[in-house]
UniProtKB/Swiss-Prot annotation:
A zinc finger (C2H2-type) spans 173-195, 201-223, 229-251, 257-279, 285-307, 313-335, 341-363, 369-391, 397-419, 425-447, 453-475, 481-503, 509-531. This is Zinc finger protein 737. It comes from Homo sapiens. The gene is ZNF737. It is found in: Nucleus. SUPFAM superfamilies: beta-beta-alpha zinc fingers (SSF57667), KRAB domain (Kruppel-associated box) (SSF109640). GO terms for biological process: regulation of DNA-templated transcription.
């Protein structure tokens, strides 16, 4: 009899038999076959990976392949299963029968069965291989041992104790580098790649390398777009089984992972692990390029792209590339119009979660961002940043055409239209055109009579928020616009602008009739009456 091969321990099912198995039994079969293969590899028996194993590793049904492709050589189809009931023990028993039948096929001269001892330890006389079925297996080359808990095959092993270590919890294989222990030497070998940085499994599509073949298999789905794991609840599909498992918690609402420090609960163990770093302040993930440390490996991975400049995630719609997949996902909503983040208060939907978070402040009335200079509070940090420019006089937005600077980017955008003369926003009611959409929106309220901005102090309403803001200063007495030349303060910015012309002598409003200049548009309007003879 030749050496034991994978085909000697492979079990195949007919289509009818496979459909009679429930999920747990199929998982048991998958685990048994994969474990058998790993044990044979560990003992140096299997040279090339059988297609059946590749199939099982990828989560495919064994029946999707031709039988001769699965195990390299024709194998015996198991027919020892009852059609109505397929208990775990039946799979074990069938496995034993198939294995023994394999050896019987090699000839009875090399395979003899004898009754006798109850266990390997009791056998002092025969000193031969014990197969776990109360029988001795006499052969010059091989010994088969059957594990009490699961169906496993060990070849050319002096005893089955090394396999049983898995069930005892012992971890005899220790990493010299970091001290971590394992119950299998093969697992230790795989672990060592973390320290050596070895990445032998390379993607033929993009060249990316991985420590483990399973990671490469998973990675390939990025290129193929394959999503084999489907949620039975909502139909959503995932590229990884772990993603599906994590997703299912959304439907159950379960949060089994609780922080002992603060009691906060999480849906995923990884989220709890990440959360714990808040209490410890630990930043274990360090960038080799710049030395910056991070709490999460995912943040480090994202950070590294800054140094490489790589943008691997490309939009198929417009070709725009991004550094992170999450940014690409968000970008795609521009094309699809999808708004997945909905406000429970008013039903308004948003493309971005950050926009929803910002929007919610409207309902709460919360103004957490306070100006240290004047005490004014704002809903959003961006509004506070913009407001501070009133005090600092900063004007970061400069016009390339004429050099005029502005506090707000929107003001610069509006200003640029002066140079183009363009007025793209037209009122459908009266035909009047405007440089800015916001001005058109405000203008339309003249026709509708809408005044949505109401003063809480006196009840007066306005058609624009800027008018309400200016009005409120009557009650507060606030004069935030101060002249740097003379120190005089004003309630409105346009009054300050007009005042400054006293110091500069500027007269921008010119009469087309006689060429005379004026500081204010109202003064020019009054002057024009001289030419028209109109009585105001």
């Amino acid at each position: 009899m030749g050496p034991l091969q994978f085909r000697d321990v492979a079990i195949e099912f007919s289509l009818e038999e496979w459909h009679c198995l429930d999920t747990a039994q199929r998982n048991l079969y998958r685990n048994v076959m994969l474990e058998n293969y790993r044990n044979l590899v560990f003992l140096g028996i299997v040279v090339s990976k059988p297609d059946l194993i590749t199939c099982l590793e990828q989560g495919k049904k064994p029946l999707t392949m031709k039988k001769h492709e699965m195990v390299a050589n024709p194998s015996v189809t198991c027919s020892h299963f009852a059609r109505d009931l397929w208990p775990e023990q039946s799979i074990k028993d069938s496995f034993q029968k198939v294995t023994l039948r394999r050896y019987e096929n090699y000839g009875h001269d090399n395979l003899q069965f004898k009754k006798g001892c109850e266990s390997v330890d009791e056998c002092k006389v025969h000193k031969r291989g014990y197969n776990g079925l109360n029988q001795y297996l006499t052969t010059t080359q091989s010994k088969i041992f059957q594990c009490d808990k699961y169906v496993k095959v060990i070849h050319k092993f002096s005893n089955s104790n090394r396999h049983k270590i898995r069930h005892t919890g012992k971890k005899p294989f220790k990493c010299i580098e970091c001290g971590k222990a394992f119950n299998q030497s093969s697992t230790l070998t795989t672990h060592k790649k973390i320290h050596t940085g070895e990445k032998p499994f390379k993607c033929e599509e993009c060249g990316k390398a991985f420590n483990w073949s399973s990671h490469l298999t998973t990675h390939k789905r990025i290129h193929t777009g394959e999503k084999r794991y489907k949620c039975e609840d909502c139909g959503k599909a995932f590229s990884r089984f772990s993603y599906l498992t994590a997703h299912k918690i959304i439907h159950s609402g379960e949060k089994p992972y609780k922080c002992e420090e603060c009691g906060k609960a999480f849906k995923r163990s990884s989220n709890l692990t990440t959360h714990k770093i808040i209490h410890t302040g630990e930043k274990p993930y360090k960038c080799e390029e710049c030395g910056k440390a991070f709490k999460r490996s995912s943040i480090l991975t994202a950070h590294k792209i800054i140094h490489s400049g790589e943008k691997p995630y490309k939009c198929e719609e417009c070709g725009k590339a991004f550094k992170h997949p999450s940014v690409l996902t968000t970008h795609k909503r521009i094309h699809t119009g999808e708004k997945p983040y909905k406000c429970e208060e008013c039903g308004r939907a948003f493309k971005y979660f950050s926009s929803l978070t910002t929007h919610k402040i409207i309902h709460s009335g919360e103004k957490p961002y306070k100006c240290e200079e004047c005490g004014k509070a704002f809903n959003w940090s961006s509004h506070l940043t913009t407001h501070k420019r009133i005090h600092t006089g900063e004007k970061p937005y400069k016009c390339e055409e004429c050099g005029e600077a502005f506090k707000y980017s929107s003001s610069l955008t509006t200003h640029k239209i002066i140079h183009t003369g363009q007025q793209p926003f037209k009122c459908e009611e009266c035909g009047k055109a405007f440089k800015c959409f916001s001005i058109l929106t405000t203008h339309k309220r003249i026709h509708t009579g809408e005044k949505p901005y109401k003063c809480e102090e006196c009840g007066k309403a306005f058609n624009s928020s800027s008018h309400l803001t200016a009005h409120k200063r009557i009650h507060t007495g606030e004069k935030p616009y101060k002249c740097e030349r003379c120190g005089k303060a004003f309630k409105r910015s346009f009054i300050l602008t007009r005042h400054k012309r006293i110091h500069t002598g500027e007269k921008p409003y010119k009469c087309e009739e006689c060429g005379k200049g004026f500081k204010c548009p109202s003064t020019l309007t009054t002057h024009k009456v001289i030419h028209t003879g109109e009585k105001l």
